């Protein structure tokens, strides 16, 4: 059955317009980009097959556009639309950070770090530098490592913060294993960063650990006190 033969309120596009994007499943959202689907399938079934064979959603969408276009049911047009939508989401969140809006909503900052770091095959430690009104000044990836970890140097974080005339920083790093639970080493590095930044009156507002699922906030755990 073609999607046009479905009840109107169950078609992905009409459902999105009537109830909002959050009402759609992953497959329904992906189906909007798929378009007509493969021969003998509707777009939602093609999207389900894509998620089943090449998913889940995060690793599927972390692929570059050139890799997406080779997947059955997508092609160049759909791949470009997906890549453009993801980049727009990234830029939208960064613009909110630059205006200081998203910093009143810690999960949004965590999502930003997740967008930047989650697809990396090795560990990356990044810093978001903020002014005295907690607006974003710059985002920098300062340290990289292997799949097992990255060497973090608090003095370099302090040096870059002073260079940017930052009043506060938020840091984050990814766990390539996919497990976002902070390790003892993560907590130890956080304490060293906190102490080093306090010496120059710069606040460490949070440390996010990025893996599969929701980023873990060390501030939320009470580990930055």
Swiss-Prot record:
Pfam families the record matches: RadC, UPF0758_N
PROSITE patterns linked: MPN, UPF0758
GO BP term, pick one: proteolysis
GO molecular function, one term: metallopeptidase activity
Residues of the MPN domain: 102-224
Motif residue range(s): JAMM motif: 173-186
Keywords tagged on the record: Hydrolase, Metal-binding, Metalloprotease, Protease, Zinc
Record carries keyword Hydrolase: yes
Source species, domain of life: Bacteria
InterPro entries: MPN, RadC_JAB, RuvA_2-like, UPF0758, UPF0758_CS, UPF0758_N
Binding residues annotated for Zn(2+), in chain numbering: 173, 175, 186
Annotated PANTHER family: DNA REPAIR PROTEIN RADC, UPF0758 PROTEIN YEES-RELATED
Protein family (similarity comment): Belongs to the UPF0758 family.
NCBIfam families listed in its UniProt record: PRK00024.1 (NF000642), radc (TIGR00608)
Protein known as: UPF0758 protein XOO0495
